[in-house]
Swiss-Prot record:
Family: Belongs to the major facilitator superfamily.
InterPro entries referenced in this protein's UniProt entry, alphabetically: MFS (IPR011701), MFS_dom (IPR020846), MFS_trans_sf (IPR036259)
Protein name: Major facilitator superfamily multidrug transporter mfsB
TM regions (residue ranges): 29-49, 67-87, 98-118, 128-148, 160-180, 201-221, 329-349, 378-398, 411-431, 439-459, 468-486, 505-525
Length: 602
């Protein structure tokens, strides 16, 4: 194996927990801007869905309105379950970026249909359409896994998307409640006998469409493809975004009238400026040099591109659903089931009137805390604020000190006692009940914000290859959607039966039993290193002896002495691990180029 001489070695980037200069901030920020559009749109309907069903006049029984409102909500979840695998596989075939953008467009279409819905069936179809056309939950997890491959960076990165969801889930309901029925709430601004009077719930949906269009534009211009093969394709949207950034920053990059490609003066372009670059795991266009195809530009045929060369050099697609992948998907489904069941049970428990029946301890008792709606809303708002804080700071701290799998198991061990103790809050003195409720809510959110990102990291690292990561995350998203659809339904039935029989603990203890099952199952799970790193290491032998022509500008296969020095000393090229005995670095005069510098996305 070839080792660089000591005098050519430069201090390499460390990827430890204290080195955050290489953290892919820009791409995660762009991804977060795309992500926040969805919870805003999804959660905006909840403040007015009851009044929307009431306006449809489908029933005269007020008690059944909640049932029909639940049907509208569940139609999205079941549709999302049925389409999750499809979108995951589609992202493996055409790339992550197109699927993410199509998901945002599909959500926008469903919001328009929902705003114009004249009856309950149309509203349900609109929500189902949103679930069918949007598979972004699994694809987003895949994209994060491919952007962040340094293990020390994963806890921080995987806490960002849940934080963004929490933020959007606060903005969405506030916006939906404020903009619904504008002719009634803002008669000075919205006149009667207008479109907003005929469709009183159209305005919040139109605003959501504007937000989603913003997400589409941001994604099209600035989001990079992360698929291991599709990222080498030419991306006109990203080129346009880079051109806009360059124009705004006063760069010399310009777009000519005759050529739509971005042209850079070759004498001024610094291809090997590695003064402050990320570690080898991050190959992003925001910091890496633009690479030319492996072949001479002049020798390329119309169908010859980097993506095709990479496909030819890589082995076939490995089996996606290995034993560890299946274990992780099952764990994700179990976690989603009992977590969403708690979210449904706790407001019902808090609002249920106190029972005057005689208690037969330790198991036979009913009733709730009888809290007013305003108090419950404030408690849940406090829970949401704490959730955002815990996502960003608590989860990375805990995982960094205890490890992902160990943390996940500890959380699952603590969770069942919480479920089993919550119904006993009715037995506490009234003066202690409020504090106990806050303690239960904070405990649940603490476990929640640690468990879900942990499963995402474990699942991403268990994937045998990034080429099947989309299918794996699609299956996980479908499993979670099914669990979130079945959980509230089954738990609601158990809670009703428990109140009728006098045992209100039935639903809570059933959730605890499901969690215990997940705890036992977690001991068959194993923690793996990020697969993208091991793939690179495994391919080092196959790349040995191949001329590293793609590291130089188009039409130039050999390096100048200055380029030799920078190439060998760069942190970007892992020549420590390569046999480059066949690498020819003989200095020759560069061949004249008739074409401008060609860019190939890295």
């Amino acid at each position: 194996m070839f080792k660089r001489p000591s005098f050519l070695r430069r201090q390499r980037h460390t990827v430890g927990r204290d080195d955050w200069s290489a953290f892919p901030v820009r791409q995660l920020f762009v991804l977060a801007l795309c992500r926040i559009c969805e919870p805003i749109a999804f959660m905006s309907i909840f403040p007015y869905v009851y009044h929307m069903v009431e306006a449809f006049k489908v029933t005269d029984d007020d008690h059944k309105i909640a049932l029909y409102a639940g049907l509208i909500t569940s139609s999205f979840t079941f549709a999302e379950f049925s389409a999750g695998m499809f979108w995951g596989r589609m992202s493996d075939k055409i790339g992550r970026k197109p699927v993410l953008i199509m998901g945002l467009i599909g959500t926008a279409i469903s919001m328009i249909v929902f705003g114009f819905a004249p009856n309950l069936p149309t509203a349900m179809v609109a929500r189902a359409l949103g679930g069918l056309l949007n598979g972004n939950i699994g694809v987003l997890q895949t994209t994060v896994a491919e952007i962040v491959t340094v293990k020390e960076h994963q806890p921080r990165a995987y806490s960002i998307m849940p934080f963004v969801w929490c933020l959007g889930s606060i903005i969405g309901p506030a916006m939906g409640g404020a903009l619904a029925q504008p002719c009634q709430n803002y008669p000075g601004l919205f006149q009667r006998h207008t479109i907003f009077d005929s469709f009183p719930f159209l305005l919040p949906n139109l605003v959501c469409v504007v937000v989603l269009v913003f997400g589409v534009i941001v994604g099209f211009l600035f989001l990079e493809e992360t698929h291991p093969e599709k990222r080498y394709r030419r991306d006109p949207g990203l080129e346009l975004g880079n051109w806009l950034i360059a124009r705004c920053s006063g760069s010399r990059v310009q777009l000519t009238e005759d050529d739509t490609d971005i042209k850079v003066d070759a004498n001024e372009a610094d291809y090997f400026n590695y003064g402050d670059v990320p570690p080898p795991e991050y190959r992003s266009t925001e910091t890496s040099p633009q690479l030319a195809p492996i072949k001479n530009v002049g020798a390329l045929s119309g169908d010859d591109d980097i993506e095709g060369q990479v496909k030819g050099e890589q082995c076939g697609t490995p089996k996606a659903f290995t034993k560890q992948v299946i274990f992780n998907i099952v764990a994700y489904g179990i976690l989603a089931y009992h977590s969403v069941s708690f979210d449904q049970l706790i407001p019902v428990f808090l609002s249920t009137p106190k029972s005057d029946d005689n208690f037969v301890l330790p198991f036979k008792f009913t009733g709730g805390l009888g809290l007013p709606t305003k108090t419950i809303g404030f408690m849940l708002a406090v829970q949401g604020v704490y959730s955002m804080i815990a996502q960003l700071w608590l989860f990375p701290f805990v995982v960094r000190h205890f490890g992902t799998l160990r943390t996940f198991r500890l959380v699952l061990l603590v969770w069942p006692p919480l479920y089993m103790l919550v119904p006993y809050l009715v037995l506490l003195p009234s003066i202690l009940q409020t504090a106990a409720v806050y303690l239960a809510l904070i405990s649940k959110i603490t476990l929640h914000v640690i468990a879900f990102p942990s499963t995402a990291i474990l699942l991403a690292n268990a994937a045998p290859s990034s080429k099947v990561l989309g299918s794996i995350n699609g299956a996980a998203a479908s499993t979670a959607s099914l669990s979130r659809a079945l959980g509230p339904t089954i738990t609601g039935l158990l809670h009703s039966k428990g109140l009728e029989s006098g045992y209100s603990i039935i639903a809570w203890w059933a959730c605890g039993l499901v969690c215990v099952t997940g705890t036992i199952q977690s001991f068959w799970m194993e923690e793996s290193e990020p697969r993208r790193d091991s793939e690179k290491a495994g391919n080092s032998d196959s790349t040995a002896g191949i001329p590293m022509r793609s590291s130089f500008p188009a039409g130039k296969e050999y390096a100048t002495p200055e380029e030799e020095r920078r190439l060998l000393s760069s942190t970007r090229t892992s020549v420590d691990d390569l046999d480059i005995s066949n690498l020819d670095l003989t200095q020759i005069e560069p061949a004249p180029r008739s074409n401008p510098l060609a860019f190939a996305e890295d």
